UniProtKB/Swiss-Prot annotation:
Residues 904-948 are annotated as: Disordered. Disulfide bonds: none annotated. It comes from Rhodococcus jostii (strain RHA1). The keyword Membrane applies. GO terms for cellular component: extracellular region; plasma membrane. Keywords: Cell membrane, Membrane, Transmembrane, Transmembrane helix. Belongs to the UPF0182 family. It holds the Pfam family UPF0182. This is UPF0182 protein RHA1_ro06389. The chain crosses the membrane at residues 18-38, 63-83, 114-134, 174-194, 211-231, 260-280, 288-308. Residues 908-934 have a biased composition (Low complexity). It is found in: Cell membrane.
Length: 992
């Protein structure tokens, strides 16, 4: 009786096949359609900003990678399937009516061409999609050059490790994938068509199956041998000793390196054993070779290095690792730009030897001491300079400097931007939101060392006066028309900015048909039509359809507000625009506005980075730059591991037309050279930077924070001392907040010790490792002539100079501060501003901290915002006293006179509202424009009796105030309060 052939899979009806095809088409459109629309709109956008060459280069590179890797991987799999099918046995015995393989064999045979092509094509498509994302690796390999620095182990140029080795790894990994997939495809094919039988005790292989599988297995192991060879070079970025140091350690160089060579030799032997199986039927030889490779990988590759580490290195770690730590120190300094030619170390005693008024640089420092904190005053700017509810300022303002009337001063600056989140009521209608409220209005600046008037002497006067506010200089539409701009701006309209872009759909539609009335809000009495070059034309129906689909907004398609000359403005965040046109750069977390040649431009710092610079310390960018400001704003660099960073590019984004320009500022960066080879016209050379723009360049905060973390460890030269951590520094915690976040660095305008002229520096205090005393002071210059020059003041290891946290504690615990704080907190919220650390008095350290008060809200419609009420200063006296003197007064001048004696504070900038525009406070009463307080009388040394009596009276008055409050006697309470104020004033009147 004949055996019934196995049944195939049930066939689909014609209707089912049609529905299946339609479903596949719809799915493809849903998957591919958005990508095509995004590609088309990106093509339009890159053309608008003049960087279409970047778009096409990246696109072509991705397509070529997709095709090459897809064809190679898919082709190898297809060839393996073809060979396995063609070498199948002629007669395939069926094991029985329930043979499961026969069922699948019949299915494959009925759709042979489908399976033979669909599988390789699917594999190739998937491989190509994954591989195309590695376009950066390929372009750096093609365009990368030499660093001119050789590694200490193999003597190869660093460029090999950063440009070549990643590409070789990329190729090797895809060959691994292709061979492995081909092996499994061959295995399954031979099994289905009878070349491989699993029935019986040992199974069976046909000669063809044995040869094909042996060749593929041998090739895979041969590739593994090549991988062992490249693994040797990867040891120079080993993480075995992290976080102590990155790079090859003693164990890596004396155990793992040799193990890689041994395993390489064993892998070659093992591959030879598999190739021998082509001629020998006995598979025990390749099986034993495989077992040898696995066993060797465990014993030689893992156990041996572990033994060396545990029994040779750990008992003598400082000596064994010394040479490798030395390599790490040298490489890290090179990779992070903190080599000795860029960093000047100076010994600094920590206490002064001269009166500040006798040091020319100190006079300049005191005159420009910053009292306004850009991290606190955003709400003050908003309340006094917002003008309309739909304008706004960023939560953290910026600092820049301007030369006005021959005087260089630092200013708190912010663009008055459109805030879409603040639109209310009918303002949120699509027409209004996207075609009427389209732009901001002007730049607002305030001298950082000045307020409109000093706060009152008593706590009650300080809390209720209209003093302590910024002195504004406004460059907007109104001031332009009036012709009274201190900082002249020709085009004050802001179409691109940080606040504008702080919404999901940040687009604006500008322009219209010829002759149409202006639509965009400009002022209460005027409307405006955009005339800039920015924006993508959407006057034609095809572009309107594309953007309607992009934003899923039908109004773009049907709105009558869109005419033949209309354009759509989007990607309005300056940082996003820079990273779009230069995807190979990492943008700094903060962009800042500056007026250059009469235009408001955003300046964005951009970095080139590498992940595996040999022996350089590897760190996470987001972890290094996070501080108390970033925790509040969420302004962080991406989560990215780096071991090399350079601020090689400064970018500008025009606030009116969105024009992006990239400038080369580091001509010795091989990474930037490579990218300039990829995109020849993207970055403009350094000599094309206008001098007016260069004058506004700041040393970037994020780079400085990365470098200060490195300098905290890598200022140490001795590798053995490095290993013990004894000489390390730490970034101090921010004493003005409750969390333990790092204190941010601060921009300050100080006197240059060599010239006495003002110098714009970025600075940070450093404390000892797990200590609070000050250990070092870092500063880096932003002046064009000395840009990027580091100065590190190193204090003695036994210093008694207080660090920021100790200084804060000593200042707020001072009796004058503590007593008045108690009074102020009854009806005010107190905020301490940036605690500045300033070298002064030829060896001393002066701390300056503004104190802001904000009245507690008394009603639902009452607006409150911070105002400068007091200034605290702290200074350590020279030995043998070493005592810490604290100044506390409404003005910096008075506080300095309390510490240094009369006359020192006379050079400080007095409160005044003469310069700039008075604040527009809305419902707030006008600010008192009165003159600055008269200078204090010359100080005389206080007697112990005077101080004791004043303190005793202060304590007694506070006790009386507490008793009166408990008794509920309002008359007694008023008398007690007056007594406290009188006691505080008497204490403050005592010369300190």
């Amino acid at each position: 009786m004949g055996m019934r052939p196995p049944a195939g899979l049930p066939s689909l009806s014609k209707r089912s096949r049609v529905l299946l095809v339609l479903a596949l088409v719809v799915a493809a459109l849903l998957l591919v359609g958005p990508r095509l629309i995004s590609t088309y709109t990106d093509w339009l956008w890159f053309g608008e900003v003049g960087f279409r060459g970047v778009f096409t280069t990246v696109l072509i590179t991705r397509l070529l990678l997709f095709l090459v890797v897809g064809v190679v991987v898919g082709g190898i799999v297809w060839l393996a399937l073809l060979l396995a099918y063609r070498s199948r046995p002629v007669f395939v015995p069926v094991s029985g009516p329930n043979d499961p393989v026969a069922r699948y064999r019949t299915t494959v045979m009925t759709r042979l061409r489908l399976f033979g092509l669909a599988i390789p094509i699917a594999v190739g498509l998937l491989a190509g999609l994954i591989a195309q994302s590695s376009w950066v690796t390929v372009q750096l390999f093609v365009n990368g050059g030499a660093f001119g620095v050789a590694d200490p182990e193999f003597g190869l140029d660093v460029g090999f490790y950063t440009f070549d080795l990643p590409f070789y790894r990329f190729v090797l990994n895809w060959l691994f994938v292709a061979v492995l997939l081909a092996f499994f495809a061959s295995l399954v094919t031979h099994y289905i068509f009878g070349g491989l039988k699993l029935a019986g005790r040992g199974g069976a292989l046909t000669n063809a199956a044995r040869v094909q599988l042996a060749v593929l297995a041998g090739t895979f192991i041969l590739l593994k041998a090549v991988a062992y060879w490249f693994d040797r070079y990867s040891l120079l970025s080993s993480s075995r000793k992290e976080p102590t140091f990155t790079g090859g350690s003693y164990t890596d160089m004396n155990a793992v390196l040799q193990a890689k060579l041994i395993l390489l030799a064993i892998a070659v032997i093992c591959a030879g054993a598999f190739f021998a199986a082509i001629f020998l039927r006995d598979l025990r030889i390749p099986a034993m070779a495989t077992a040898l490779l696995v066993l060797s990988s465990i014993l030689v590759g893992a156990v041996w290095p572990l033994v060396v580490e545990q029994f040779s290195v750990r008992p003598n770690a400082a000596d064994k690792e010394s040479a490798y730590i030395e390599r790490n120190i040298a490489a890290t300094r090179q990779a992070y730009g903190i080599t000795d030619d860029k960093v000047e170390y100076q010994d600094y005693q920590g206490y002064g030897t001269k009166p500040p008024r006798d040091v020319p640089a100190d006079v300049m420092t005191i005159e420009n001491t910053r009292l306004l904190d850009p991290n606190i005053l955003s709400r003050t700017f908003t309340q006094q300079q917002q003008l309309k509810n739909f304008y706004g300022f960023p939560p953290t303002l910026d600092i820049d400097r301007y030369d006005i009337d021959g005087q260089l001063r630092d200013y708190i600056v912010a663009a008055r931007e459109l805030s879409s989140k603040s639109l209310t009521g009918n303002q949120t209608d699509w027409i209004n939101k996207h075609t009427v409220y389209t732009h901001g209005n002007g730049l607002v600046a305030a001298p950082a060392n000045r307020v409109n008037a000093a706060a009152g002497e008593s706590a009650e006067e300080a809390a209720n006066s209209n003093s302590g506010y910024p002195v504004y200089m406004v460059s907007d539409i109104a001031s332009q028309e009036a012709g009274n701009q201190v900082i002249p701006v020709q085009q004050p309209r802001i179409y691109y900015g940080e606040v504008i872009a702080d919404t999901d759909a940040d687009y604006a539609i500008v322009g219209g048909s010829g002759g149409s009335d202006p639509r965009e809000y400009d002022t209460d009495t005027s409307r405006y039509t955009y005339t800039g070059s920015g924006g993508v034309p959407i006057g034609n129906w095809f572009n309107r359809l594309a953007f309607a689909a992009k934003y899923t907004e039908r109004n773009i398609l049907f709105s009558g507000a869109i005419g033949s000359d209309s354009k759509i403005i989007y990607n309005r965040d300056p940082r996003d625009r820079v990273t779009h046109v230069a995807p190979w750069l990492t943008a700094d977390g903060d962009s800042y506005p500056a007026v250059v040649d009469g235009k408001v431009v955003w300046i964005v710092d951009a970095y080139t980075t590498l992940q595996d610079y040999p022996y350089a310390q590897r760190s996470s960018l987001d972890g290094l730059v996070e501080d108390s400001i970033d925790q509040n704003t969420g302004r962080l660099l991406p989560r990215k591991e780096v071991s090399y960073i350079r601020n090689s590019v400064k970018a500008t984004v025009d606030a009116y037309d969105g024009t992006v320009k990239l400038y080369q500022v580091d001509q010795n960066d091989p990474v930037l050279d490579a990218w300039m080879g990829v995109f020849p016209d993207a970055v403009q050379p350094a000599d094309s930077i206008p001098d007016e723009l260069r004058a506004h360049f700041r040393y970037p905060e994020d780079l400085f924070k990365v470098q200060r973390e490195m300098l905290a460890k890598y200022h140490v030269d001795d590798p053995k001392e490095f290993f013990t951590n004894n000489a390390f520094w730490s970034v101090p915690s921010d004493p003005t907040i409750d969390t333990s976040a790092n204190q941010p660095p601060y921009y300050v305008l100080v006197g240059d010790p060599e010239t006495g002229k003002p110098s714009f520096n970025l600075t940070s205090a450093m404390v000892g490792y797990s200590r609070e005393f000050l250990s070092a002071y870092l500063s880096v210059k932003s002046d064009p002539e000395n840009y990027g020059k580091f100065t590190v003041l190193q204090l003695p290891t036994d210093t008694q100079t207080q660090g920021p946290q100790q200084t804060q504690n000593s200042m707020i615990s001072d009796p004058r501060v503590a007593s008045e704080r108690t009074l102020l907190e009854r009806s005010n919220k107190i905020q301490y501003g940036n605690l500045l650390t300033l070298p002064i008095a030829d060896g001393g350290i002066l701390y300056v901290e503004p104190m802001y008060t904000e009245r507690s809200s008394t009603g639902p419609n009452t607006s409150t915002f911070p105002q400068l009420s007091r200034v605290l200063v702290s200074y350590r006296e020279p030995p043998p006293s070493n005592s810490v003197r604290v100044g506390y007064a409404p003005t910096l001048a008075q506080a300095l006179d309390q510490v240094f004696g009369a006359g020192t504070g006379s050079v400080a900038t007095a409160p005044s509202a003469e310069e700039g525009t008075p604040p527009e406070t809305g419902t707030t009463p006008p600010v008192d424009q009165g003159a600055a307080p008269a200078p204090t009388a010359p100080a005389t040394p206080p007697s112990g009796t005077d101080v004791s009596a004043a303190v005793a009276e202060l304590d007694a008055s506070l006790d009386a105030l507490t008793s009166a409050q408990r008794s509920g006697d309002f008359a007694a309470y008023g008398a007690a309060l007056a007594r406290v104020q009188k006691a505080v004033a008497a204490y403050e009147a005592i010369p300190k």
